[in-house]
From Swiss-Prot:
It comes from the Bacteria. Binds to the N-terminal domain of the chaperone ClpA. It comes from Desulfotalea psychrophila (strain LSv54 / DSM 12343). GO terms for biological process: protein catabolic process; proteolysis. PANTHER family: ATP-DEPENDENT CLP PROTEASE ADAPTER PROTEIN CLPS, ATP-DEPENDENT CLP PROTEASE ADAPTER PROTEIN CLPS1, CHLOROPLASTIC. This is ATP-dependent Clp protease adapter protein ClpS.
Length: 102
């Protein structure tokens, strides 16, 4: 490979622009049946929140009907929503989460 060709290839690699993936909010929705303790447990287990932060989010959900559990790439956000729905169903709670593009 010639020196000119090597310089051309490296310049092309250096010129490639990388973009951050779009981020999505995972929203937790209030309902009249899911216990506050279960919501706090979900926030701690699935979203890695401290107990204090989880309780704050849970109170926001309770008073405002919706709260943000976290901000993730689409694939991770979808996975977390699916896990929450599965755990809620196993525990016979109607807890719902959704995604919202940032």
């Amino acid at each position: 490979m010639t020196e000119d060709k090597q310089q051309s290839d490296s310049a092309t690699i250096d010129d490639i622009e990388t973009r951050e993936p779009p981020m999505y909010r995972v929203l937790i929705h209030n309902d009249d049946y899911t216990s506050m303790d279960f919501v706090v447990a979900i926030l701690m287990q699935i979203f890695s929140k401290t107990e204090a932060v989880a309780e704050e989010i849970m109170l926001t959900v309770h008073s405002s009907e919706v709260g943000v559990a976290g901000l993730y790439t689409h694939e991770i956000a979808e996975t977390k929503v699916a896990i929450v729905h599965q755990l809620a169903e196993q525990n016979e709670f109607p807890l719902r989460c959704s995604l919202e593009k940032e």
